[in-house]
Amino acid sequence: MEDRTRAIGDAADAMTDDELETAIAALHARERELLVAGDSEAAFDLMGTKFVLLFTLESRRR
């Protein structure tokens, strides 16, 4: 999992703020769809990705 998180972080670092915001919104929408469908495991996986992107965006804004 750590390698995956690192790879996502590297990809997030290469994104613009607008790209990050768009990706975060898309992940959030998909996460909600998965939760409504009862697939909490897949939603949880997306949540982890979303948090990496959020952390990257917030770190830039400090």
What are these regions (language model features)?
Residues 22-62:
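Short, charge-rich amphipathic interface segments used for partner binding and complex assembly
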Residues 2-22:
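Short, charge/polar-rich alpha-helical segments
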